[in-house]
């Protein structure tokens, strides 16, 4: 387990995308248009390599701009978002992170883990939200 903060979180997400072989599951509390470009590129590169990428975004009542994501993505929207974002790779490693105080401009805090038992629990959380969200179609 490693604690990451601020820009280290984004570096960790990029590294995880580069290591992905089969799947990336993402619960993002921010929209793709708000993500750093290098994060969008990491997801796009993974998709191009044949990695299955599933993403859940908050339903904010606006059109979702996916123009920075190139490739194939399964995208869903939900009104029920956890305060922290989660990225799960190959059901082996995951990172949970968010602002130390929700809805603030404070420090980003995160925790990366490569423990399969905890990754299985993260997968259950993801699947529960995914199955109860709506399919996004542009």
Residue ranges, per PLM feature:
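PLD/PLD-like phosphodiesterase catalytic module centered on the HKD motif
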Residues: 1, 6-10, 19, 23, ...
